[in-house]
Each structure stands twice: as structure tokens, then as C-alpha cells.
């Protein structure tokens, strides 16, 4: 509650469209990656935790690796997820947990959406769980790369309409990864655009993205 109050005051934090996730029995949350704040910002309006995936190399960084392990973050190679990491992720989903993934694999260097890494497609194929696209706007301005000071600026989060298991069925076999990635990217882009409009104009989303 303290953290939520701080973000609402300092960043004018607002989120939209997250309510369906409160009752979702296991789902993937795919988000654009703007800053180190992103896992906190995405999870803030929810009354349940999100287990985010982070690149394996971060677990070797002193202090950072310890924090990641203590906050239930799971390690993954974005280019080619190992069998063990895939199994752990899918087990969490099948036990009803929310799992967050940054398809870009790393934070944006300039605020724009970066190219998606293909590794998340393998998780989507095997998990058979809905995908919730999420767009963040303003976090890059609040805490860009190499910055250690949180700047007071508006941050908006838009949770989009889920991509259902039925919709994902057509991508269940290998060879369809490019089409799957394109679909996910288009949904995240729509959420990012809605979040940016909300951030700059003050107009909240009127329809699900």
C-alpha cells in the first residue's frame, strides 16, 4: 500500500484493464520493457504476485542475483530456453500462477519497442494458457538506463484483452513462431499506444486493446 501510494503520488501512476487477471487461473503476461521498475509497475494493481522471467546472466550479478531469487524471479535464456527453465515456467502456470515475460529480453535503450526475442514462443506453445498483452508508457522517462534517480513523470499501464487459448491453437506447432510473435507484438503495440495517449492527453482507454 505504501509503495502504491508513492507511485501514485510521484509518478501519477494509473493502470487500466487488469481486473480480469484477479480471477485468471494461470496466465502469461507479456510486457514491453522500459525500466527496472516494470515488474513492480505491472504487479502493483493486482492482489496476487507475478513471477517474472529474467535473463540467466542477471543471476550471476552480486546482490541482484540474490534479490531475484528471493522475489521468485525465474531464469531463462531468451534465445533458446532450456528444458529445465521451460518445465519450471509451465509448472508455475499450471499451478495457477501468473508469469510475466518481457519479449524484448532487455530494457529499451531509447524508449521505443525493441525487436522481440524468439524464446518466449516455445513457452506459449507448451503452456496452453491465455496471454495478456500489457503496455507501459512513461517508465523510461521516469527511470531510463544508467539513471539511479526516479523522475516525477506520468506512468500509465494498459492491460489488453487476452489472446485466448483457442486463438493460440493455430500456433501450437513449430514453424509458426514468426506469426505468433507478430500477433503478440501487435497486441502489445496497441496497449503501448493506448498507454501513451493516456499519459500525454489524460484520456483513459475506452475500449479493450
Tell me the role of every PLM-derived stretch.
Residues 8-9, 22-80, 88:
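Catalytic core of membrane glycerolipid acyltransferases/transacylases, capturing the structured
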Residues 8-16, 140-142:
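Short gly/ser/thr-rich secondary-structure transition/capping motifs
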Residues 14-24:
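Membrane-interface helix-loop junction between the first two transmembrane segments
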Residues 19, 56, 77, 135, ...:
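Residues at the C-termini of beta-strands that transition into short coil/loop
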Amino acid at each position: 500500500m505504501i509503495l502504491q501510494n508513492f507511485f501514485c503520488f510521484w509518478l501519477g501512476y494509473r493502470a487500466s484493464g487488469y481486473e480480469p487477471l484477479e480471477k485468471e487461473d494461470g496466465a502469461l503476461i507479456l510486457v514491453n520493457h522500459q525500466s527496472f521498475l516494470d515488474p513492480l509497475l505491472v504487479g502493483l494493481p493486482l492482489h496476487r504476485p507475478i513471477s517474472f522471467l529474467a535473463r540467466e546472466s542477471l543471476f550471476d550479478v552480486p546482490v541482484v542475483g540474490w534479490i531475484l531469487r528471493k522475489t521468485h524471479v525465474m531464469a531463462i535464456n531468451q534465445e533458446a530456453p532450456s528444458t529445465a527453465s521451460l518445465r519450471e515456467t509451465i509448472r508455475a502456470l499450471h499451478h495457477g500462477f501468473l508469469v510475466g515475460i518481457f519479449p524484448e529480453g532487455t530494457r529499451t535503450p531509447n524508449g521505443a519497442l525493441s525487436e522481440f526475442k524468439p524464446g518466449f514462443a516455445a513457452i506459449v506453445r507448451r503452456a496452453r494458457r491465455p496471454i495478456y498483452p500489457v503496455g507501459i508508457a512513461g517508465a523510461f522517462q521516469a527511470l531510463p538506463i544508467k539513471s539511479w534517480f526516479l523522475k516525477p513523470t506520468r506512468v500509465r499501464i494498459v492491460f489488453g484483452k487476452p489472446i485466448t487459448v483457442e486463438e493460440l491453437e493455430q500456433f501450437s506447432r513449430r514453424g509458426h513462431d514468426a506469426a505468433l510473435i507478430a500477433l503478440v507484438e501487435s497486441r502489445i503495440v496497441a496497449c503501448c499506444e493506448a498507454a501513451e495517449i493516456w499519459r500525454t492527453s489524460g484520456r483513459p482507454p475506452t475500449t479493450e486493446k
